[in-house]
């Protein structure tokens, strides 16, 4: 055999066989010598070998003829058999109802370009079948922590991969040193992989544009090498051991646009990154040991997003005043941040997070931020002046959680574009009067607003979709709710004085209802009117004894009556043909006949029965059907 053969190729690099550079293993697999990663193990079948020898040309021709015949057979087929591939990946124990099968079906519809197997680690056993997907460009194996290294090495044979996600898997230094085989890779994520200590091998990925190594806490080598990747535009090293020395390895004239160093506690000085004029997104949240170089932030003229949450030495916005292109700014939990002077120059800001800035007392400087759409001032304990709020005419989202000094809802009545409002923990609010002008409001949170006594002012909010009400101890009547005809989700918790729940039964469009720790809730006869209900949670409502109309809720997918200790009847439970999740924990008053009806629920997947008297015969039948029991 002379020159390059036209009838065979190496199973690893997919290059045609060349005489003199091949080895034949006893398992009859042939590879280029340089492609054999482990010296005494076959990369294809992982069989251990006792010796290696040069491939015989005549035997190669015989193997190649068989290979070509197999290729002709495959070419004549209509495509890859999803069922067969699913069984191979799952070691033969996978059915057509498995998650692997569903993911493969989705990939087939996309012409096998994208395959997402994240979270399928409990089913995946053998990745060898992936070699048939030669067109695969995007693969996600995140959370598949049970796959051994020899299985993960199969991924390196998919030479057309552009994007690869391997979060929280068993990849290690050996895998990283071999990844250079993926010549076209542009996106790589190996977050949370504790076996990685040296990332020097990643520098062979000359086409790489985005790299994420978040939470790879054991990395000690290679930070300086990856910073030299010529095409790298996005680098994320959150919760790693990056130091000031590693920061100095980043070339100021590089192409980096996104840089994330959140919770890197070894970083103390930001001076080294001051020359990176190309940066558009920078995250330093949780880097609480930074004491130097904050003045360098003003040099990032192209910066669009900045997160310096938790910076203990940031006291004023003056160092940020030149970032005129900034659209997103987060300085949350900067305990010493007091002075907002300088923010008024950031006229392009869309989103501002000041939550947990205990020193902020006035919002006067935000009045000029006419483009602001989202503002979070939760937990600003010293805030007493809200004069700037009424001028934010484009504001759509406002979080005022735990701002105890906020008492007058009328101060925001002119914010007509408001879509989401969180007033949780504003315990001095006594009335919702003023909210009726926010006609576009879609989500409202009123948790811990203990002085509110009525919903009457918000009855006209027809666009409201989600309402959270918790620990409103003085709320006795739900009148006004019936007018919110567009409400889809209602969460009512700990309203112990409330006695009139009738308005809830008029919410014909509601899909999710949660009523927990409502001590006076007894009569649920109106439930039958909520025909579109998909999720119902009745938690800790001890006065409920029968629920005789539950069988009429044909669209119900999730039902929870946990810790309703006096519940004795669930009428029509067997008619809930769409029910997928059922929680009867702590319902010790239910009879055996109720539990027997569980065997008639065809779509049941999860059952919670802790603290209930569930017959053994029911548990055995549910286990046989593959129901997850807790």
UniProtKB/Swiss-Prot annotation:
The keyword Repeat applies. Pfam families: LRR_EndoS (PF23952). Keywords: cAMP biosynthesis, DNA-binding, Leucine-rich repeat, Metal-binding, Repeat, Zinc, Zinc-finger. GO terms for molecular function: DNA binding; zinc ion binding. A zinc finger (RING-type) spans 10-46. The keyword Zinc applies. InterPro entries: Leu-rich_rpt_Cys-con_subtyp, LRR_dom_sf, Znf_RING, Znf_RING/FYVE/PHD, Znf_RING_CS, Zyg-11_UBL_adapter. SUPFAM superfamilies: L domain-like, RING/U-box. GO terms for biological process: cAMP biosynthetic process. It comes from the Eukaryota. LRR repeats lie at residues 184-206, 207-230, 231-251, 255-277, 278-301, 302-324, 325-347, 348-370, 371-393, 394-416, 417-439, 440-462, 463-485, 486-508, 509-531, 532-554, 555-577, 578-599. May interact with adenylate cyclase to regulate its activity. May be involved in the postranscriptional regulation of genes in VSG expression sites. This is Putative adenylate cyclase regulatory protein. It comes from Trypanosoma equiperdum.
């Amino acid at each position: 055999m002379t020159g390059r053969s036209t009838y065979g190729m190496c199973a690893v690099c997919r290059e045609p066989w060349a005489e003199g550079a091949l080895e034949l293993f006893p398992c009859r697999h042939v590879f280029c010598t340089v492609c054999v990663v482990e010296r005494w193990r076959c990369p294809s079948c992982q069989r251990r070998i006792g010796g290696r020898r040069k491939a015989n040309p005549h035997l190669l021709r015989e193997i190649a003829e068989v290979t070509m015949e197999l290729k002709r057979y495959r070419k004549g087929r209509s495509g890859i058999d999803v069922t067969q591939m699913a069984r191979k990946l799952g070691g033969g124990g996978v059915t057509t109802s498995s998650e692997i099968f569903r993911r493969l079906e989705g990939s087939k519809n996309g012409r096998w370009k994208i395959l997402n197997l994240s979270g399928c680690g409990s089913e995946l056993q053998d990745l060898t079948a992936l070699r048939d997907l030669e067109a695969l460009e995007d693969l996600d194996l995140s959370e598949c922590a049970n796959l051994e290294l020899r299985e993960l090495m199969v991924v390196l044979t998919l030479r057309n991969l552009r994007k690869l996600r391997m979060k929280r898997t068993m990849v290690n230094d050996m895998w990283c040193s071999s990844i250079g085989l993926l010549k076209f890779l542009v996106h790589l994520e190996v977050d949370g992989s504790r076996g990685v200590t040296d990332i020097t091998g990643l520098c062979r990925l000359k086409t790489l544009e985005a790299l994420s190594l978040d939470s790879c806490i054991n990395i000690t080598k290679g930070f300086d090498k990856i910073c030299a990747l010529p095409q790298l535009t996005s680098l994320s090293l959150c919760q790693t051991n990056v130091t000031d020395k590693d920061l100095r390895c980043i070339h100021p004239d590089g192409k980096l646009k996104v840089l994330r160093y959140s919770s890197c506690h070894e970083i103390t000085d930001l001076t080294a990154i001051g020359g990176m004029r190309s940066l558009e997104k920078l995250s330093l949240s949780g880097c609480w040991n930074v004491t130097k170089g904050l003045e360098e932030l003003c040099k990032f003229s192209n910066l669009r997003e900045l997160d310096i949450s938790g910076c203990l030495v940031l006291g004023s916005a003056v160092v940020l005043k030149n970032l005129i292109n900034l659209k997103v700014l987060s300085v949350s939990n900067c305990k010493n941040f007091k002075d907002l002077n300088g923010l008024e120059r950031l006229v392009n800001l869309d989103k501002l997070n000041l939550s947990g800035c205990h020193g902020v007392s006035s919002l006067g400087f935000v009045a000029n931020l006419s483009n602001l759409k989202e503002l979070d001032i939760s937990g600003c304990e010293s805030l007493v002046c809200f004069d700037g709020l009424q001028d934010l005419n484009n504001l759509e989202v406002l979080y005022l959680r735990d701002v105890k000094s906020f008492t007058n809802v009328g101060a925001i009545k002119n914010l007509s574009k408001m879509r989401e409002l969180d007033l949780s923990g504003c315990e001095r609010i006594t009335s919702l009067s003023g909210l009726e002008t926010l006609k576009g409001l879609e989500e409202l949170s009123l948790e811990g607003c203990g002085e509110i006594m009525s919903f009457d002012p918000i009855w006209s909010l027809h666009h409201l979709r989600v309402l959270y009400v918790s620990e409103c101890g003085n709320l006795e009547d739900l009148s006004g709710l019936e007018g919110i005809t567009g409400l889809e989700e209602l969460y009512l918790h700990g309203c112990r004085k409330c006695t009139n729940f009738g308005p809830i039964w008029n919410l014909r469009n509601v899909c999710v209802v949660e009523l927990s720790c409502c001590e006076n809730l007894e009569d649920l006869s109106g439930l039958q009117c909520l025909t579109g209900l998909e999720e119902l949670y009745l938690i800790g409502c001890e006065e409920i004894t029968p629920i005789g109309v539950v069988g009429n809720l044909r669209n119900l997918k999730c039902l929870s009556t946990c810790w309703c200790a006096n519940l004795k009847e669930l009428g029509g439970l067997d008619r809930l043909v769409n029910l997928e999740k059922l929680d009867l924990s702590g319902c010790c008053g239910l009879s055996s006949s109720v539990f027997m009806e569980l065997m008639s629920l065809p779509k049941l997947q999860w059952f919670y029965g802790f603290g209930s008297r569930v017959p053994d015969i029911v548990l055995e039948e549910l286990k046989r059907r593959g129901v997850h029991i807790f």
